Every structure is written in structure tokens, then in C-alpha cells.
């Protein structure tokens, strides 16, 4: 389930994102020259077929920082959302973000890669978590629906 709608920065006490193991992250393709590495924790991927949403934890690692985000992709319409974030090993905090266009002004290129490489099959959510993991690991090129 999505964390309750809380103001950005509010500590989550319920609806916490799933636990993850940084040693198991699936590295996601980044633009050449990027100093940030992004990985998806495969054990956190879940599918809500009724809502058409894939949820997951992404971990961004840079030279001096590590941030994890609990996110979702809504394939039908090409939208994404950050539900919560945490710095290093700190507490999960509500992100205060609504659903946004994957191609909008606040878009993140890696989100489109996730949709393309396994989370979405055209405008539909991929309901097979194992297939999503395989697609992300192999860089599979599924057709992304542009809403």
C-alpha cells in the first residue's frame, strides 16, 4: 500500500517501505559521465495489478551521499511518484509528492529505463515480479507507453 499522505519530511511510523539489501541491488543504466549510481532492490518490487502500479526501492549512491527512495510507476499514463525517502540509514520520511509525468519537468531518466526494461509492457503493468527482475538485470527493452 502507498504510505499515507503526509507532509514532506514527516517521519513514517506505519506503511514503511520493504526492507532491502544493498548488496543485491540491480544497477540501472545511467547517462555517460554520471557520478551517481542507481540500483533497484529486487526484493522490494511489488505489483498492485488492480491499481496498475509497480512499487520498489531505489538506492542512489554518489561520491559523498547515499539516498533511498520508495517509488512507484503507473504504466497506464506514464506516471511515477516518490512515496518516501531516507538519507543513508536514517528514518523513512514522507516525500509529499503526487503522481507526475515521467516526461515532465521533474522527470528522472532512470524511471523511464525501469518502465522500458521490465516494469511496464506497453501501457500495462507487468504483473510478474520475476519477469520484472529478469528484465532489469538484462536491460530488456519493453515498449514503454507514452501517455
Placement of each model-derived feature along the sequence:
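C-terminal partner/receptor-binding element of secreted or periplasmic proteins
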Residues: 93-147
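Generic structural hydrophobic/aromatic packing signal, biased to beta-strands
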Residues: 28, 56, 80-83, 120
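N-terminal secretory signal peptides
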Residues: 1-72
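Residue-identity detector for glutamine
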Residues: 30, 50, 79, 87, ...
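Mature, folded catalytic cores of secreted/periplasmic enzymes
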Residues: 33, 81, 145-147
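A short, surface-exposed interaction/processing loop segment used at functional sites
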Residues: 77-103
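General "foldedness" signal
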Residues: 42, 70, 85-87, 94-96, ...
